[in-house]
């Protein structure tokens, strides 16, 4: 059976022995790691351990699985690690295994402690006596890249939290001071600014000619040049939109020339339009269109071509500007004959009529 646990209290070694007991086992191997009182001439008071709990438990269970795959005869495996402050001479980690033979127990425990130091995310901080600053220590056996370790500065992360507002360690993910955080934000902003500047140079600056040396202190803001797109008046790419209806969609409009040929085209000599029919067509179509366009009829020659030309002109104006009617110089109403002015006849009195008669007689 596997016994994996992270504890905050002192580890009970007698309890570990009870977990290893089994009638079929003839050997038990126990490793106990304790806190020593010195490091490189400095007096060590205690060790402080922190861990990413969920991942640490997961990795410790994987170590147990690896042990059983290498030594199938193992009966019980115990891995207990203490978190928090561990004073001198107290146990910080206990790894034990029981098996029918001593070789499997001894080899498995040695392998387990090496894997624990290498894989499990547990960090150790040494607290020294006197004015020496505490230091976070890395495991030499760790498989993590040195770059990732150096980028995380544990010593620059003083954490002062009131006891009434204590935050669980597993919820803290950014453990840097304000200066380090500001530095990272500044680097991020500078990198984004460089990307924008590079894109502006591509969009607004001509590539330097062979004869003109490139200026080292030039930028798109001071030496920008608008590069016009093909068939466009600006540097922005313009796409043509094909409407499915309305004046721009000319394909959906009827073929007027074909319709006119069907109605007025000559089929046989006997079916040619009569003079009356020609006059009717002229009055109903040609005169209306030419009046609307502000044109006066000049000749009756090639009447169908004139109709087709006028209709094409109207279609063109509609496609360009539907409001073209409001900008024509000659309004259709101006071609109509002016209405006769209504004048009111003057009324004469009897005295005025008498004077007018006397004047005529005297002449």
UniProtKB/Swiss-Prot annotation:
Location(s) in or outside the cell: Cytoplasm
Domain of life: Eukaryota
GO MF, one example: molybdopterin synthase activity
InterPro entries documented for this protein: MoaE_sf (IPR036563), MOCS2B_euk (IPR028888), Mopterin_biosynth_MoaE (IPR003448)
One GO location term (cellular component): molybdopterin synthase complex
Reactions catalysed: 2 [molybdopterin-synthase sulfur-carrier protein]-C-terminal-Gly-aminoethanethioate + cyclic pyranopterin phosphate + H2O = molybdopterin + 2 [molybdopterin-synthase sulfur-carrier protein]-C-terminal Gly-Gly + 2 H(+)
EC number: 2.8.1.12
Function of the molecule: Catalytic subunit of the molybdopterin synthase complex, a complex that catalyzes the conversion of precursor Z into molybdopterin. Acts by mediating the incorporation of 2 sulfur atoms from thiocarboxylated Mocs2A into precursor Z to generate a dithiolene group.
Subunit annotation: Heterotetramer; composed of 2 small (Mocs2A) and 2 large (Mocs2B) subunits.
Similarity comment: family membership: Belongs to the MoaE family. MOCS2B subfamily.
Protein name listed in UniProt: Molybdopterin synthase catalytic subunit
